[in-house]
UniProtKB/Swiss-Prot annotation:
HAMAP family according to UniProt: Guanylate_kinase
Localisation per UniProt entry: Cytoplasm
Species annotation: Trichormus variabilis (strain ATCC 29413 / PCC 7937)
Protein name according to UniProt: Guanylate kinase
Keywords, comma-separated and alphabetical: ATP-binding, Cytoplasm, Kinase, Nucleotide-binding, Transferase
Family statement drawn from the similarity comment of this UniProt entry: Belongs to the guanylate kinase family.
Domain Guanylate kinase-like stretches: 20-198
Length: 199
């Protein structure tokens, strides 16, 4: 049985949350992280989902403040310089970052906080919060991943090639994370995440 550990002795951060729990969900673009996260939150409203900030344009159906905080590059760089992000990374030419204050407040109040972030950001979180539980979502195959990315119909061939190259590199990092879950059968993958979080 998997147990999610409380965050304690975060020696590499100024903050020292001791009562909450931090969960990091990551994996390559197109693997289904967002869909899994949405379903997880629908089933477990007690979870606190940290909404990331990004400089990329909204995709169809995305809502500002729910899917992401959509902000300008200048605003992002200003917040970054002020130390307002717990982690930040650049992906496909856009910045992504996790607002620091909201996450730390929720952890300190005893909440289970879940982050859905890119690999570079997940590595930053692991360095700052070694007690965090990290979950890496894998595709059933590289061919399926390419099919999913192409199925979005949003990227040029050049952008797709970049995403696939990056995915190859990211998949090689899966073993760095506490748990690896293959998103082949959606319901099974979702249940595996629930077991990791709740036992």
């Amino acid at each position: 049985m998997m147990q999610v550990l409380s965050i304690q002795n975060c020696a590499t951060t100024k903050e020292n949350p001791s009562s909450g729990k931090l969960i990091v969900l990551t994996g390559p673009s197109g693997v289904g992280k967002g869909t899994l996260m949405r379903s997880l939150l629908q089933r477990h409203p007690e979870l606190y989902y940290s909404v990331s900030a990004t400089t990329r344009a909204p995709r169809p159906g995305e809502v500002n403040g729910e899917s992401y905080y959509f902000i300008s590059r200048n605003k992002f760089e200003e917040l970054l310089a002020q130390g307002e992000f717990l982690e930040s990374a650049e992906f496909a030419g856009n910045y992504y970052g996790t607002p620091r204050e909201a996450v730390l407040n929720q952890i300190q109040s005893g909440k289970l906080v879940v982050l859905e972030i890119e690999l570079a950001g997940a590595r930053q979180i692991r360095a700052s919060f070694p007690e965090a539980l990290s979950i890496f979502i894998l595709p059933p195959s590289f061919e399926e991943l390419e099919k999913r990315i192409r199925g979005r119909g949003q990227d040029s061939e050049e952008a797709i090639a970049r995403r696939l190259q990056r995915a190859t590199e990211e998949i090689q990092a899966a073993d760095e994370f506490d748990i690896q879950i293959v998103n082949d059968d959606f319901e099974a993958a979702l249940q595996a995440i629930e077991v990791a979080l709740f036992g």
